[in-house]
């Protein structure tokens, strides 16, 4: 899913935090950058003035403006034209420095937004890079119920009617927290991190068959809702299996695997839904087991090692 942001949207988002003033190029407010564009061409999202590998947001600090002032008139004009030619999303001048008139004119003529901020260059760089990276990060919407269980993000998935919402309701009654029902949105904010949030229209809501839509915040209190959580585990509910001993399920290690989400392989544990099974307890146990495995503790491996040692000690 591609996301985009316009110069106007970025300015409105950061105006108060960075004390931005828009001094030229107001006609370029609809200029935009999208995630597909950044992945295809791989420019830096924000950085100090660079006329060789241009950034999407060019920051002009004291050294950059001093360097421009030191150029001969023809070279200065050529450099400013080159900056404009790269078509950045915006130019930002730091520390409330005076903007050169020729740069202001060039920004107006080419409709390149030109902003001024009292913040220092590295503050602008860090802040804009961070927020642009989050806004334009790859994202996906998955079907399921996303919850915080024992302080980690767990996505409960399964076909319609498998009992996801009823399980979520039981987990809520046991003190765990809801992030999103039905359509949680996941954003890859780092190479190994998927951040899950709830769409605004679904905020605080949980749909349970027979009961309809429930407001979790009103029923369980503010502490039952979590704004966002990193996805660490997927628990998948399967349809009932009638065989007494289901083939394909490892008795020692359980049914564990991974699911590919965006660029990450997320650990997955499959639980068969059968009459009489307490899925809430099983989901809690699956979460605890995952936490142990991340610490290098695997009960199945320990048992296999004990069994092997016992066989080795037995006389022939």
Curated annotation (Swiss-Prot):
What is the top EC class of this enzyme, as a single word? transferase
Keyword Nucleotide-binding: yes or no? yes
Task: Provide the E.C. number(s) assigned to this enzyme.
Answer: 2.7.11.-, 2.7.4.-
Q: Where is this region: Important for the catalytic mechanism of dephosphorylation?
A: 272-277
> InterPro entries annotated for this entry?
HPr(Ser)_kin/Pase, Hpr_kin/Pase_C, Hpr_kin/Pase_Hpr_N, P-loop_NTPase, Ser_kin/Pase_Hpr-like_N_sf
Establish whether keyword Iron is in the entry: no
The source's superkingdom equals: Bacteria
Q: Which Pfam families match?
A: Hpr_kinase_C, Hpr_kinase_N
According to its UniProt record, which cofactors does this protein need?
Answer: Mg(2+)
Q: Which transformation does this protein catalyse, written as a reaction?
A: [HPr protein]-L-serine + ATP = [HPr protein]-O-phospho-L-serine + ADP + H(+); [HPr protein]-O-phospho-L-serine + phosphate + H(+) = [HPr protein]-L-serine + diphosphate
* Region of interest: Important for the catalytic mechanism of both phosphorylation and dephosphorylation: 206-215
**Residues binding Mg(2+):** 165, 207
Annotated residues that bind ATP are located at: 158-165
Alphabetical GO biological process terms? regulation of carbohydrate metabolic process
> Per its record, what are the GO molecular function terms?
ATP binding; magnesium ion binding; phosphorelay sensor kinase activity; protein serine/threonine kinase activity; protein serine/threonine/tyrosine kinase activity
Record's keyword terms, sorted: ATP-binding, Kinase, Magnesium, Metal-binding, Multifunctional enzyme, Nucleotide-binding, Serine/threonine-protein kinase, Transferase
Span of the signal peptide: none
Active-site positions, per UniProt?
143, 164, 182, 251
What CDD domains does the record point to? HprK_C
Q: Which PANTHER family match?
A: HPR KINASE_PHOSPHORYLASE, PROTEIN YJDM-RELATED
Q: Main role?
A: Catalyzes the ATP- as well as the pyrophosphate-dependent phosphorylation of a specific serine residue in HPr, a phosphocarrier protein of the phosphoenolpyruvate-dependent sugar phosphotransferase system (PTS). HprK/P also catalyzes the pyrophosphate-producing, inorganic phosphate-dependent dephosphorylation (phosphorolysis) of seryl-phosphorylated HPr (P-Ser-HPr).
Subunit structure of this entry? Homohexamer.
Q: What is known of its domains?
A: The Walker A ATP-binding motif also binds Pi and PPi.
Q: Cite any additional comment in the entry.
A: Both phosphorylation and phosphorolysis are carried out by the same active site and suggest a common mechanism for both reactions.
The similarity comment for this entry is: Belongs to the HPrK/P family.
Give the protein name, as stated in the record. Answer: HPr kinase/phosphorylase
**What organism does the UniProt record list as the source?**
Xylella fastidiosa (strain Temecula1 / ATCC 700964)
